[in-house]
Amino acid sequence: MDRMKKIKRQLSMTLRGGRGIDKTNGAPEQIGLDESGGGGGSDPGEAPTRAAPGELRSARGPLSSAPEIVHEDLKMGSDGESDQASATSSDEVQSPVRVRMRNHPPRKISTEDINKRLSLPADIRLPEGYLEKLTLNSPIFDKPLSRRLRRVSLSEIGFGKLETYIKLDKLGEGTYATVYKGKSKLTDNLVALKEIRLEHEEGAPCTAIREVSLLKDLKHANIVTLHDIIHTEKSLTLVFEYLDKDLKQYLDDCGNIINMHNVKLFLFQLLRGLAYCHRQKVLHRDLKPQNLLINERGELKLADFGLARAKSIPTKTYSNEVVTLWYRPPDILLGSTDYSTQIDMWGVGCIFYEMATGRPLFPGSTVEEQLHFIFRILGTPTEETWPGILSNEEFKTYNYPKYRAEALLSHAPRLDSDGADLLTKLLQFEGRNRISAEDAMKHPFFLSLGERIHKLPDTTSIFALKEIQLQKEASLRSSSMPDSGRPAFRVVDTEF
């Protein structure tokens, strides 16, 4: 009995002395008693004995960010028992030791942390004091970010607020919307502000809703970026990245003669953005030079997704302007509603030809005239070239002359044999026979661009490769107001 009291007294003195517990491999050392009564660390080969109450602390790995749990030390008497009254008798199980949370100093949060977590532009300028505020409330960076928290965080930065953007020049106006050139206070970058009025009884145009729903999920270097959405009682404002001009304006500025190397770069980027859309099961369905935006670096981006996934392709816009037929495939012109990714590939072929020659391939003003232009160059279809065409009521109504197909190379002499072959594969009567965007990128026409261009991540520009450079145009005008009278800055869908 005296021997046990001596052991308890020694243990009590140790605890009162505040001797810390060494940590090995992130776990506390166990204190035990051997047969001789001496206190010491347990051998790794032995089973650990009961730990002394009030001394053990939870181990925390060096990289853990969870708050540390600390068992509260109890005052111990000379016999090794607690001086505090116990609610249990000696033959009952002792209650668990009370715990308290140890608060660690808040983790420093960087601008890079915020940009990565909230998917912000790298050049964003955060409001003064925002970093400090987040540092005090950093748990949102220690756990998955809910949609509500992300929305609140973006709002605090300035997203979703009209006052974050400065309107500069008016670029276009339609029945439902006005488009402005603007500037972001967050980045100092130029933006395009598409302000859609909601005072109409039917609310926001379905094209705008469709465009928003698609673009917020499409992240690609060759697709225009939707930066922000601002919804008020009277308007819906879409904030897009701002690009210098569209392909039509680029053609105008070049005197309709684009360097063939640049034609190849523009076509590859068009196919690259389109292939990404098609992988996402999205059809553009309104490809034309005015919907392809180009910046000073030569980056081409698909814009205006207002008709994507539409149940039908209208002949007029919201401002009652006629939608151009020049880039519409013959199967759609003849009433087909069997939409697939090949619907876009015909338009790619027409745009390819226009870049190579400086003029539209099929400039019809009515459906009948448009088909006439197509058949005069590609030949009037027969049952052999287009099975089932003779039973098409629309086709029979027009009663076209029997044209023979002409060589495309004779109409586009600047194309080499590979270019003419690719153009032929794009301009097939039946959609199922047209080459896909993915396969077109692998066509021999693009061999000179090298292999690395096919291995880039979706969000990386082709101009990130040192071997890819836009060549200087022989007659490029730098005027901000082309002869057509339109500003040399194209934004997304100025037609409504």
Curated annotation (Swiss-Prot):
<keyword id="KW-0472">Membrane</keyword>
<feature type="modified residue" description="Phosphoserine">
    <location>
        <position position="36"/>
    </location>
</feature>
<keyword id="KW-0963">Cytoplasm</keyword>
<feature type="modified residue" description="Phosphoserine">
    <location>
        <position position="146"/>
    </location>
</feature>
<feature type="modified residue" description="Phosphoserine">
    <location>
        <position position="478"/>
    </location>
</feature>
<keyword id="KW-0968">Cytoplasmic vesicle</keyword>
<feature type="modified residue" description="Phosphoserine">
    <location>
        <position position="65"/>
    </location>
</feature>
<keyword id="KW-1003">Cell membrane</keyword>
<keyword id="KW-0221">Differentiation</keyword>
<dbReference type="GO" id="GO:0010508">
    <property type="term" value="P:positive regulation of autophagy"/>
</dbReference>
<dbReference type="GO" id="GO:0015630">
    <property type="term" value="C:microtubule cytoskeleton"/>
</dbReference>
<feature type="domain" description="Protein kinase">
    <location>
        <begin position="165"/>
        <end position="446"/>
    </location>
</feature>
<dbReference type="GO" id="GO:0007283">
    <property type="term" value="P:spermatogenesis"/>
</dbReference>
<feature type="active site" description="Proton acceptor">
    <location>
        <position position="286"/>
    </location>
</feature>
<dbReference type="InterPro" id="IPR050108">
    <property type="entry name" value="CDK"/>
</dbReference>
<feature type="modified residue" description="Phosphoserine">
    <location>
        <position position="480"/>
    </location>
</feature>
<feature type="modified residue" description="Phosphoserine; by BRSK2">
    <location>
        <position position="12"/>
    </location>
</feature>
<dbReference type="GO" id="GO:0005737">
    <property type="term" value="C:cytoplasm"/>
</dbReference>
<feature type="modified residue" description="Phosphoserine; by CDK5">
    <location>
        <position position="95"/>
    </location>
</feature>
<dbReference type="InterPro" id="IPR000719">
    <property type="entry name" value="Prot_kinase_dom"/>
</dbReference>
<keyword id="KW-0067">ATP-binding</keyword>
<feature type="modified residue" description="Phosphoserine">
    <location>
        <position position="42"/>
    </location>
</feature>
<dbReference type="InterPro" id="IPR017441">
    <property type="entry name" value="Protein_kinase_ATP_BS"/>
</dbReference>
<dbReference type="GO" id="GO:0043005">
    <property type="term" value="C:neuron projection"/>
</dbReference>
<comment type="subunit">
    <text>Found in a complex containing CABLES1, CDK17 and TDRD7. Interacts with BRSK2. Identified in a complex with NSF, syntaxin-1, synaptotagmin, SYN1, SYP and CDK5R1. Interacts with YWHAH, YWHAQ and YWHAZ. Interacts with CCNY; this interaction increases the CDK16 kinase activity. Interacts with CCNYL1; this interaction mutually increases the stability of CDK16 and CCNYL1 and increases the kinase activity of CDK16. Interacts with NSF.</text>
</comment>
<feature type="modified residue" description="Phosphoserine">
    <location>
        <position position="153"/>
    </location>
</feature>
<comment type="similarity">
    <text>Belongs to the protein kinase superfamily. CMGC Ser/Thr protein kinase family. CDC2/CDKX subfamily.</text>
</comment>
<dbReference type="GO" id="GO:0031175">
    <property type="term" value="P:neuron projection development"/>
</dbReference>
<dbReference type="GO" id="GO:0004674">
    <property type="term" value="F:protein serine/threonine kinase activity"/>
</dbReference>
<feature type="compositionally biased region" description="Basic and acidic residues">
    <location>
        <begin position="69"/>
        <end position="78"/>
    </location>
</feature>
<comment type="function">
    <text>Protein kinase that plays a role in vesicle-mediated transport processes and exocytosis. Regulates GH1 release by brain neurons. Phosphorylates NSF, and thereby regulates NSF oligomerization. Required for normal spermatogenesis. Regulates neuron differentiation and dendrite development. Plays a role in the regulation of insulin secretion in response to changes in blood glucose levels. Can phosphorylate CCNY at 'Ser-336' (in vitro).</text>
</comment>
<dbReference type="GO" id="GO:0005886">
    <property type="term" value="C:plasma membrane"/>
</dbReference>
<feature type="modified residue" description="Phosphoserine">
    <location>
        <position position="82"/>
    </location>
</feature>
<feature type="region of interest" description="Disordered">
    <location>
        <begin position="1"/>
        <end position="97"/>
    </location>
</feature>
<dbReference type="GO" id="GO:0006468">
    <property type="term" value="P:protein phosphorylation"/>
</dbReference>
<dbReference type="GO" id="GO:1901987">
    <property type="term" value="P:regulation of cell cycle phase transition"/>
</dbReference>
<feature type="compositionally biased region" description="Polar residues">
    <location>
        <begin position="83"/>
        <end position="93"/>
    </location>
</feature>
<keyword id="KW-0808">Transferase</keyword>
<dbReference type="GO" id="GO:0030252">
    <property type="term" value="P:growth hormone secretion"/>
</dbReference>
<feature type="modified residue" description="Phosphoserine">
    <location>
        <position position="89"/>
    </location>
</feature>
<dbReference type="GO" id="GO:0106310">
    <property type="term" value="F:protein serine kinase activity"/>
</dbReference>
<feature type="modified residue" description="Phosphoserine">
    <location>
        <position position="110"/>
    </location>
</feature>
